[in-house]
Structures are given as C-alpha cells and as structure tokens.
C-alpha cells in the first residue's frame, strides 16, 4: 500500500529545542512559506495547520499559501461552537475553490475548558461532542448541495445552503481525532478519516478495531491516519542523540508546569498521551523506536519515531499493517527536518504523491440577483 505522508506548519512557534527560547526562531509568513514550499517539492501530500489560541489562524495561513504551492493540500480546523456550520461550509467551499480542490478539514472539539470559555464555549465534554455531531450533520449536507432545515439541541438552521459549490465532490474530506467513546461514535457516523496520536501499535490497533466496528454497524467505512513527530538521521545512534538534544535544555520545573497545564484538559486523548511518560524523563522509549519526550511539554501529539531511514520506515509499516494510510509527521525545526525526512526516510517508503490538480471548470453566471439566486440565461432567440 502506498502511504500518504503529510507535514506540519508550526504556527505556534518553532526552534531547535523544546521548553526553552534557546534556538528559537521567528515564525513569520516568509518562514511558513519556506516550509510549505519545501513540503510541496519534497513529495509530502499535505500539511496540518494547528488551531487554538497559541496558533496563528489556520484558515488565513492556508489561504495565504495556496498561491505559492502547487500540489500541497491544507488540513485546517473546523471549530463547532465557535462558528456556525453554514458559515463554516461557505468558508470550506471557498477555500476548496481557491485551492483548486486542495482543501481538507479537521473537526476539532477542543479539550481545554479555560481556552474554550475564552471562545464563548461553556459545554462539558459530552455536550461538546453532541454539538459537534449536530454541527457536522449540517456542515456536510450544506457542502453536498442540500438546502437544510435542522433543529437540534445545539444547532438550529432554516434554509441553509451554498451558492458556490466546492471543487471536490460531493464535498472535501472530513478528518477527526478523538479517543473517548463519544468521539469514536462521531467518527464512525460522520467522518472520512479518523486520526489517532502516536500511541504504541497495540493501542492503535485497539482504537482502529473499535472505530471499524462502530462504522460497520452504521454501514460505513472509515480511513485511518496517525499524527507523529519524527527524528530521522543517517544512523540510529545519531537519531537518539538528536532526541536527547531536543530536550537537553528542559528543566524539571518546566516539565511540571507543562504537565499541570495539560492536566486540566478533559481530552481523553491528552490523558492517554500523558500516561505514556507520566511526566518523567527516565523511560521515554515506550515502544521500539517510539519516544515520548515531546509530550513532556507539548500538548497534543507527544511521541516521535526515532531512528535511521530504514528503521523509521519499518515502524511506519507496522502502523500501516494495522490500517493506517496517512502519516502526519513533524520535527524540530520544521524546515530542516522536512528535508531530512525527504532525503533519509522517503527513499524507504512507497509514497502516494498527489499530482498537480488540473484547473477546475468554473461556470460564468454573472452577479447573483438580490443576493439570492443566479441570473437566468437569455434565450437563444432573444440575444
């Protein structure tokens, strides 16, 4: 099976080391453009753009990088509760049209009550997923061309519709990650690609089996992806030395503060990530070549594959054998590590590299009448 490998745009900061400003670098548009263009040229299938108050806005970043890339796809966040599903569908269709079919969407419910409150979201874990399910039902149907009337507990729309269709039909793919029971139910019911963070293969196998069973019970199939960091070097020893250097400026106080901040989340996935290392740096290789050092201070994806090209490729194949089709990778700093992955890892993988999309046909229709409908064609005999 050919694998699709994505990279990551570090809109929340970048540098050579974790937990310190030593080796940090400014992340401006020029730098993000360098990373995006490197990923585009090296053969990455797309880039994940993170979301949250610590990040630049994912939609604006993606839109700004469309003109300077050719084949790269952009995976950006949908935020139920922060935006209406109808408006999100309009934005999704526009991004898909502007990118000529290179837009992908990642449903993010959030897990930090403090940050969510700042965005005006005061729902508990279960209610957020109920809202996300309602949001997604409307979002999908509107993007697929329906005029939607829907009244749920959290979402109420009447006559919701699009006037400009997306390029990808029936709509751009929807991605989603979540480890709780309600999250997996949502994935089984509505999403196209289920994402997991980089847990050991045995745990990933269990997750995939649960989501597959839930999807099958609904008459659906779901594809699977995984989010990992990667530290690849010419030799295994060099890779492990690089892993040690990444946290070499990290002190115990910073680790403790980071773990305390992450502990306030109600995200089951984040709790599972934290359990892999327990906030301690003495046993970070939690599975062969799977290192949990990143998660000492980073929320979300907290594990890295470490080794030379053949070793990392073999570990990726273990995940692929479980059903993983897409790998979303990253490394510090993201520009240099994109090239290392391209030069040291890609030769050992069978890659699914997207082609440059052909321009989509856009039908001329004139200005919409009264902001409500497209003007009619003039009959042939009346011209």
Curated annotation (Swiss-Prot):
Record's function text: Catalyzes the desulfonation of aliphatic sulfonates.
Protein name (Swiss-Prot/TrEMBL): Alkanesulfonate monooxygenase
Gene coding for it: ssuD
InterPro entries found in the cross-reference section: Alkanesulphonate_mOase_FMN-dep (IPR019911), Luciferase-like_dom (IPR011251), Luciferase-like_sf (IPR036661), SsuD_RutA_monooxygenase (IPR050172)
The organism of origin for this protein: Erwinia pyrifoliae (strain DSM 12163 / CIP 106111 / Ep16/96)
Keywords: Flavoprotein, FMN, Monooxygenase, Oxidoreductase
EC number: 1.14.14.5
Catalyzed chemical reaction(s): an alkanesulfonate + FMNH2 + O2 = an aldehyde + FMN + sulfite + H2O + 2 H(+)
Broad class of enzyme this protein falls into: oxidoreductase
Subunit structure: Homotetramer.
GO biological process: alkanesulfonate catabolic process
GO molecular function, one term: alkanesulfonate monooxygenase activity
Taxonomic superkingdom: Bacteria
Keyword hit for Transcription: no
More info: FMNH(2) which is absolutely required for this enzymatic reaction, is provided by SsuE.
Xref: Pfam families: Bac_luciferase
Keyword Flavoprotein included in the entry's annotation: yes
Family (UniProt): Belongs to the SsuD family.
